[in-house]
Each structure stands twice: as C-alpha cells, then as structure tokens.
Amino acid sequence: MELLQDAEFDLESYISAEIARAFGVAEEQAFCVGTGANQPTGIFTANGGAVGVTAAAASTVTADELISLIYALKSPYRRNAKFLMNDATVSAIRKLKDGNGVYLWQPALQAGQPDKLLGFDLVTSPYVPTMETGALPIAFGDFNNYWIGDRMGR
C-alpha cells in the first residue's frame, strides 16, 4: 500500500491498465482461435461456421477469391462487414492488382481510420491463422453480430 502512496505517478491506474491490456490480449486470442476447452471457441476454429471460399493455392489468395468471399456473405450482413486477417496475409494482399495494374488496397484517408480492401474496412490480429494448407486465414463478416458473453464462476 505504501508503494501506491509513494509513487510519483498514478501507479494504481498503470497497474489496472496493464491488467486490462493483458486480459484483452488473452481474449482476442481466444475469440480468434480458442478451442472451446476452458475458453471460447474461436471464430477460426468453430465447426459450425461455413467456409465461403476455398483458396486455390495454400499460400496465396487472388482478387477473384476475395470478391467471391464478399459475395458468399448474405447481403444483409455485407453493409457493415469487415475483413479480419493477420499482417502476413495483409502483406500478400497489398500486392494484388486489378486487370489495369491498380492496387486493390486502399489506404485510410485519415489517421486512425481503417484501411480498405475492395471498399470494406480491414482489421488485423496476430492471432488469425496464416495462409497455409487447411488454414482459414481471412474472415469477412459483420462482427457487430458476434456476441460475447462472459460468465462468472466457470
């Protein structure tokens, strides 16, 4: 207690923020790839989720596959949809061009705003699987409809 009182900065707020950050990181990982055993089943590991598009190659994705992924989602859910992927997948996708040699990637016009891919926001997480055989490296959907319930006493 004395340490909290003698600190030259708000140590209590700092500790609270670090604990919240650590919980946030753990929850992000579980919500992406959780196994369902003492943690939520992640959106990339859920058996009930439908795969909209299967890539032709294990380590690449094409513009046509991204377009097919967008339209695999029912139209009511596309309006607020976003892409979710890891940085390695973003790196590969940033290099994709259309038939006229124009990049599909659209950087954000304002600081703090998400980048765009084919007109949709794109967010990243280090916990999304990488592009490899059998992996699901990209999610596209309206994540406002992804409900999370924290239960006490589990």
Task: Set out the residue ranges of the language-model regions.
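Structured, hydrophobic secondary-structure cores that serve as assembly/anchoring elements
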Residues: 1-154
